[in-house]
């Protein structure tokens, strides 16, 4: 392997590692305001940092003070040149697995019973239009021995291409008096562009009539017209009786 290829490989590994570190830092700092993810984009003017969160105003801060602090940390701690921070609001937080995982972890930290908090999270996800959802809580739930409880609603994909296309998964941890508890949220969702392969939808009568009419028009365009009696006689060279 040439030196140039090694340098390219090292460069992309360093970029990926930097993004993971920045993501962990922002998740630790803003988990209570619905932090979702971060994107780093290289530009000729520097690095564009896009932060996705449920409560974007809490990350911006009063008069932009919080964003200024984030910019300083990104530049000094993580070595990101000229970071330009942009905060984007998550439009459907109930369909974002990481936002819901942090919500569930915060509810456990505030003292809510794990089963009640899990079912509340599940209902909100399904109420937002998800295909299915799974919520898993693990730790010392009701005794000295660690265990887990899992709650499922709808259809949750666990294998195949639909896991990549339609499934969102996130994990969060919370420190309680009894120890550390973990939560896992899996959401199967669909959009106008991405739909499940096994989805069956019955067309409405209006859609069926529209399809039938279209087929009839295509058949009329492709089907040749029947020849008249005179044309038939001329082609055969005979006479009508």
Swiss-Prot record:
InterPro entries reported for this sequence: KH_dom, KH_dom-like_a/b, KH_dom_type_2, KH_sf_prok-type, Ribosomal_S3_C_sf, Ribosomal_uS3_arc, Ribosomal_uS3_C, Ribosomal_uS3_euk/arc
Domain KH type-2 per the UniProt entry, residue ranges: 22-91
Protein origin, superkingdom: Archaea
UniProt name for this protein: Small ribosomal subunit protein uS3
Keywords for the protein's UniProt record, in alphabetical order: Ribonucleoprotein, Ribosomal protein, RNA-binding, rRNA-binding
Function: Binds the lower part of the 30S subunit head.
GO (cellular component) term, any one: cytosolic small ribosomal subunit
GO molecular function: rRNA binding; structural constituent of ribosome
């Amino acid at each position: 392997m040439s030196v140039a290829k090694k340098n390219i490989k090292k460069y992309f590994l360093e970029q990926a590692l930097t993004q993971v570190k920045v993501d962990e830092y922002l998740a630790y700092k803003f988990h209570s305001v619905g932090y979702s993810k971060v994107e780093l984009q290289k530009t000729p003017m520097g690095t564009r940092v896009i932060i996705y969160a449920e409560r974007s105003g809490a990350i911006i801060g009063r008069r932009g003070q919080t964003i200024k602090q984030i910019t300083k940390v990104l530049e000094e701690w993580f070595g990101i040149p000229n970071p330009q921070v942009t905060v984007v609001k998550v439009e459907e937080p109930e369909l974002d697995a990481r936002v819901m995982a942090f919500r569930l972890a915060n509810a456990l930290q505030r003292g809510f019973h794990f089963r009640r908090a899990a079912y509340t999270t599940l209902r909100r996800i399904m109420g937002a239009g998800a295909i299915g959802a799974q919520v898993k809580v693990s730790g010392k739930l009701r005794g000295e021995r660690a265990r887990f409880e899992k709650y499922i609603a709808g259809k949750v994909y666990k294998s195949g291409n639909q896991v990549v296309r339609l499934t969102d998964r996130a994990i969060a941890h919370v420190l309680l008096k009894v120890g550390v508890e973990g939560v896992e949220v899996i959401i199967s969702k669909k959009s106008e562009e991405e739909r499940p392969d096994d989805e069956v939808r019955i067309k409405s009568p209006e859609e069926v009539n529209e399809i039938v009419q279209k087929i009839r028009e295509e058949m009329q365009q492709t089907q040749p017209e029947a020849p008249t009696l005179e044309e038939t006689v001329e082609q055969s060279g005979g006479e009508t009786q």
